[in-house]
Curated annotation (Swiss-Prot):
Keywords per UniProt: Acetylation, Nucleus, Phosphoprotein, RNA-binding, Systemic lupus erythematosus
PROSITE patterns on file: HTH_LA, RRM, XRRM
Lineage of the species this protein comes from: Eukaryota, Metazoa, Chordata, Craniata, Vertebrata
Role: Binds to the 3' poly(U) terminus of nascent RNA polymerase III transcripts, protecting them from exonuclease digestion and facilitating their folding and maturation. In case of Coxsackievirus B3 infection, binds to the viral internal ribosome entry site (IRES) and stimulates the IRES-mediated translation.
Pfam families: La, RRM_1, RRM_3
Stretches assigned to coiled coil: none
InterPro entries tied to this protein: La_dom_prot, La_HTH, La_xRRM, Lupus_La, Nucleotide-bd_a/b_plait_sf, RBD_domain_sf, RRM_dom, WH-like_DNA-bd_sf
Quaternary structure, from the entry: Interacts with DDX15. May interact with RUFY1.
Keyword Phosphoprotein (UniProt): yes
Name listed for the protein in its UniProt record: Lupus La protein
CDD domains: LARP_3, RRM1_La, RRM2_La
Amino acid sequence: MAENGDNEKMAALEAKICHQIEYYFGDFNLPRDKFLKEQIKLDEGWVPLEIMIKFNRLNRLTTDFNVIVEALSKSKAELMEISEDKTKIRRSPSKPLPEVTDEYKNDVKNRSVYIKGFPTDATLDDIKEWLEDKGQVLNIQMRRTLHKAFKGSIFVVFDSIESAKKFVETPGQKYKETDLLILFKDDYFAKKNEERKQNKVEAKLRAKQEQEAKQKLEEDAEMKSLEEKIGCLLKFSGDLDDQTCREDLHILFSNHGEIKWIDFVRGAKEGIILFKEKAKEALGKAKDANNGNLQLRNKEVTWEVLEGEVEKEALKKIIEDQQESLNKWKSKGRRFKGKGKGNKAAQPGSGKGKVQFQGKKTKFASDDEHDEHDENGATGPVKRAREETDKEEPASKQQKTENGAGDQ
């Protein structure tokens, strides 16, 4: 009984060894594996077992050359050859790699499947074990965040379109009682694109609603501000002296009402005063103090407390003028920032007051947003994380590619 148990364990180990090595030299991984491609160029495709056992996943299975050779000799795939001295292995020359054409890439894409619903602490081995009876799998890509955390979703490449279709069309698939979302890779990206479009539409709608709400708040605030100033405007007009200025008005009403704003320019024949309190009261106090004859630079003046629509329009103009004045003041304050001591601007060529920022503009891929991969491994300018599949190389020479070691 013990012998049977040992035989079963050895058979299971040999199967894992074959699977791992045949993955390394397989159609999907080998074209992407820079390190392994360099090795097979050195000796007619032969790679020393001494090199192979430095690959982490194989290393965890065994470092015994005899066990590896025995396992490969029993493989039904007949993908690998063993050297006469049993110290090297290579992919059989009779089984060359497929040419990576557009047709080939489309074929790979058509047998690629998206699966979501795994726990984020699931390992590559957990997922491989779950997929064992689901058809022959050539590659597993564990999708990860920028911080290398597993998202709970994977891309799987099956050996044939038929296998992929059978898997996708199998209803009610679960992982440990958790329902899984299963789609062809193309369907997944089509779904994501549709979601993005919908998100953009919703974002525009939200932005419009927020803008309308903001505008309403501003209008309400403006109306409240107007209401608070109702009855506070005093218009003056007449044949005013050309030297009449706002200071004259401040002096005239200094003890009778606090002035908040004066809409008047020197040389004009009329203007408007905005008081903090009611204009009628300030006007009455000023007249009483001047025996009813309220003049400006000895010129007769007509005084009128504004009401109704005329008052509202005048208030709106004053509020706009106040805001414009505030903006100019802020802008002027910004211009003075960054100058040297004594508010003197840095002299040209001095290098003082200058700050230059240099560097690259970095763009980060967001969650679930940038997984449209070229099936031959080309990724453009974006480097891919090495954790996403079960490909690996010797730890000392690990390449940072998309389909790097799953859980080193």
